[in-house]
Amino acid sequence: MQLGLWFGLFAVAAAPLVSANYGSPGRGAGRQIQYLPGGPSEGLEEYVNAATGGSQPSANQLTAQAEIQIVGEARRLGRVQAQLQALNNNPTYQKLKNSEDIAESLAETNLASNIRQGKINVVSPQFVDQHLFRSLLVPSGHNNHQVIATQPLPPIIVHQPGAPPAHVNSGPPTVVRGNPVIYKIKPSVIYQQEVINKVPTPLSLNPVYVKVYKPGKKIEAPLAPVVAPVYSQPQSYGQPQAYNQPQAYSQPQSYGNSGSSGAGNSGPSSDSYAAGAETPLYASPAPYGSPSY
């Protein structure tokens, strides 16, 4: 009973103190927002003022001081914003931004930025003629390479190390030495059992299928008909007609007959040399045994 009496007296004495500090819900609504603002920082300013003795400026004053700008800086920012707004409202810029003219430059800028930052190492920047299309071969792993094309690619293009780029369709097996060999092949012309990597190209709705071959791998290297004679001309080096002409060098009949009719001692020798068809070069001494000497 005595405990309840003391509790009631304490509640009556504490009521005026609570109303003085925080105010009643009806009359102190404004002050409640001021001292206990809503949001994630509720009550933070009150604690800061209590800890610093009221010397810390309020959050509104800090924000106002931070937003003070220099006149020249404010003027420059205004000009930039005006230019940006005018550029966005320009129909020519909108058309250019949505067209294919700027897509290639954006892709090249992105690649150049990655290369400068060391994110991409160019393996062979000119493995294909730049007049045909532009692309980069970059390593994406230990045994993987990735081809980034910045322009639509022709149907079939190949570049062999030490040989110029050429259109391809068939050719003998070849061992790749040096840089990898890249094939640009349309989906309708895939004819080899190799892994095909589909590379999306900007400015083109048709994907490009790329074959990447590692150095030292034996592959079927297609060659175009216009380039095939350059690589497969056994006639120019082997020419059996020019080098294997036993008729011109081994004609023992003509020399042997003249030698046998003119001198009896030279006839048997010329016939003996002429009998060996496998050694036609030894028939040449026959003219020296002619009657003219």
Curated annotation (Swiss-Prot):
<keyword id="KW-0964">Secreted</keyword>
<keyword id="KW-0732">Signal</keyword>
<dbReference type="GO" id="GO:0042600">
    <property type="term" value="C:egg chorion"/>
</dbReference>
<dbReference type="GO" id="GO:0005213">
    <property type="term" value="F:structural constituent of egg chorion"/>
</dbReference>
<protein>
    <recommendedName>
        <fullName>Chorion protein S36</fullName>
    </recommendedName>
</protein>
<comment type="similarity">
    <text>Belongs to the chorion protein S36 family.</text>
</comment>
<feature type="compositionally biased region" description="Polar residues">
    <location>
        <begin position="235"/>
        <end position="253"/>
    </location>
</feature>
<dbReference type="InterPro" id="IPR008449">
    <property type="entry name" value="Chorion_S36/S28"/>
</dbReference>
<dbReference type="GO" id="GO:0007304">
    <property type="term" value="P:chorion-containing eggshell formation"/>
</dbReference>
<feature type="signal peptide">
    <location>
        <begin position="1"/>
        <end position="20"/>
    </location>
</feature>
<dbReference type="Pfam" id="PF05387">
    <property type="entry name" value="Chorion_3"/>
</dbReference>
<comment type="function">
    <text>Chorion membrane (egg shell) protein; protects the egg from the environment.</text>
</comment>
<feature type="region of interest" description="Disordered">
    <location>
        <begin position="235"/>
        <end position="293"/>
    </location>
</feature>
<dbReference type="GO" id="GO:0007306">
    <property type="term" value="P:egg chorion assembly"/>
</dbReference>
<dbReference type="GO" id="GO:0005576">
    <property type="term" value="C:extracellular region"/>
</dbReference>
